[in-house]
């Protein structure tokens, strides 16, 4: 959430930033809603003060045996009570209108983020590896998996509908191995703390991660009002919800391997074949909670951690900076890591690493205190995929495929699959 004090002071900067995201000016409307709310609150506070004063004056009038004045004051107090009864309801309405408007505004892009309409304006900043040249036409992952008889979309559809997959045998083991490998790298070598988190969370937790109210249609909600997590970012970031941290404890770095659940409401007709876009998938997530001064350096570090996983797996990839038109709602800057898929003949996203500033910290009321300073600041948060397990499995299938349809297992994964070197039908 943005800082309304900043918006009041720099309304033109807000509208300039929103224009970079293709959004109409909002500062005037927000300031008006805020003024209405604050004016009403001031009236309520004034009425409460007068009620309290009048109540004391009643006692003074009675002590002075001035019954007429006491009755007059009682009538005034009753009148104020009637006003406050309706005013409280109005205050709630005005506050909800203001907070709803403020909570639907995206974060402010950093100055070095390129302005663009969509992904076509993203900027490639580096490559790793060279896509392999095959002496045969490389297949896509769904053909490879089905030919191995270890990737079943028909049975998955009977079980759950579209955008689900049943993996079996060596492919199921390889998927499990990938998640364990990624988590081991981040925890043992990159300095993240492994965390096992709930998969069901409350409204305020999803709100704190900036996925509510704007993205409710993209999520799954249970009948008792809880939400299935779309990413472990949601619970990991909220581990510091409503907490005051000491600066000496920062940064906090968390990592978790979880299933993720997404309705893909806005993805009709996109990636309908295969495992690229699923309602349920595994992902290793990285989250950092840090200070304003350290957040940009932490973004570079987190992105390097995600890249390191792909380097160890020998997968060609490129890293891009997302333009303002392609960047996520809560992000100030995002690096996407895109892995090469020879079957598709293109790069596809496998990780996003974003710095969110204090956007989530403000929603969560998560703050930190500097040593010797009583002033509290909102924490800065970052999140990144470390990486998407299913998409990494896809990349291994396509990049390590052989002419006979078998799949070579990368060396670093072989200890996780009991020394298996190749997957065959």
Swiss-Prot record:
HAMAP family: Ser_tRNA_synth_type1 (MF_00176). ATP binds at residues 262-264, 349-352. L-serine binds at residues 231-233, 285, 385. Its main location: cytoplasm. SUPFAM superfamilies: Class II aaRS and biotin synthetases (SSF55681), tRNA-binding arm (SSF46589). It is found in: Cytoplasm. NCBIfam families: serS. This is Serine--tRNA ligase. It comes from the Bacteria. Its EC number is 6.1.1.11. It is an enzyme of class 6 (ligase). Homodimer. The tRNA molecule binds across the dimer. GO terms for biological process: selenocysteine biosynthetic process; seryl-tRNA aminoacylation. One of its GO terms (molecular function) is serine-tRNA ligase activity. Belongs to the class-II aminoacyl-tRNA synthetase family. Type-1 seryl-tRNA synthetase subfamily. It holds the Pfam family Seryl_tRNA_N. Pathway: Aminoacyl-tRNA biosynthesis; selenocysteinyl-tRNA(Sec) biosynthesis; L-seryl-tRNA(Sec) from L-serine and tRNA(Sec): step 1/1. One of its GO terms (cellular component) is cytoplasm. It catalyses: tRNA(Ser) + L-serine + ATP = L-seryl-tRNA(Ser) + AMP + diphosphate + H(+); tRNA(Sec) + L-serine + ATP = L-seryl-tRNA(Sec) + AMP + diphosphate + H(+). Catalyzes the attachment of serine to tRNA(Ser). Is also able to aminoacylate tRNA(Sec) with serine, to form the misacylated tRNA L-seryl-tRNA(Sec), which will be further converted into selenocysteinyl-tRNA(Sec).
């Amino acid at each position: 959430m943005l800082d309304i004090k900043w918006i009041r002071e720099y309304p033109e900067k807000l509208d300039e930033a929103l224009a970079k995201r293709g959004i109409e000016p909002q500062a005037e409307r927000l300031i008006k809603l805020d003024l209405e709310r604050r004016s009403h609150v001031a009236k309520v506070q004034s009425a409460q003060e007068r009620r309290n004063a009048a109540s004391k004056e009643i006692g003074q009038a009675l002590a002075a045996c001035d019954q007429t004045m006491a009755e007059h004051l009682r009538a005034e107090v009753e009148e104020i009570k009637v006003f406050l009864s309706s005013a409280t309801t109005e205050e709630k309405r005005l506050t909800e209108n203001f907070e709803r408007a403020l909570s639907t505004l995206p974060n402010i892009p950093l100055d070095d983020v390129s302005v663009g309409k969509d992904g076509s304006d993203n900027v490639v900043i580096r490559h790793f590896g060279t896509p392999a040249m095959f002496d045969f036409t490389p297949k896509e992952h769904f053909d490879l998996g089905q030919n191995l008889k270890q990737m079943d979309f028909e049975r998955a559809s009977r079980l759950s509908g579209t955008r689900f997959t049943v993996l079996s045998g060596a492919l199921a083991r390889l998927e499990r191995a990938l998640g364990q490998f990624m988590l081991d790298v981040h925890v043992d070598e990159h300095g993240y703390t492994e965390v096992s988190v709930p998969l069901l969370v409350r409204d305020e937790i999803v709100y704190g991660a900036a996925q509510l109210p704007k993205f409710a249609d993209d999520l799954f909600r249970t009948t008792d009002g809880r939400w299935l997590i779309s990413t472990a970012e949601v619970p990991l970031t909220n581990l510091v919800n409503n907490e005051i941290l000491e600066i000496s404890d920062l940064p906090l770095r968390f990592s978790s391997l979880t299933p993720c659940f997404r309705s893909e409401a806005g993805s009709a007709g996109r990636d309908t074949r295969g495992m690229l876009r699923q309602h349920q998938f595994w992902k290793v997530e990285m989250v950092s909670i840090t200070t304003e001064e350290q957040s940009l350096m932490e973004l570079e570090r987190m992105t390097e951690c995600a890249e390191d996983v792909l380097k160890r797996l020998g997968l060609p990839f490129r890293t891009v900076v997302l333009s303002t038109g392609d960047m996520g709602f809560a992000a100030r800057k995002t690096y996407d890591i895109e892995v090469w898929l020879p079957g598709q003949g293109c790069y596809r996203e496998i990780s996003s690493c974003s710095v969110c500033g204090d956007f989530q910290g403000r929603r969560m009321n998560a703050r930190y205190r500097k040593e010797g300073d009583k002033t509290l600041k909102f924490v800065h948060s970052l999140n990144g995929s470390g990486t998407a397990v299913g998409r990494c499995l896809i990349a291994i299938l396509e990049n390590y495929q052989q002419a006979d349809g078998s799949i070579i297992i990368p060396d670093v994964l072989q200890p996780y699959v009991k020394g298996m070197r190749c997957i065959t039908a």
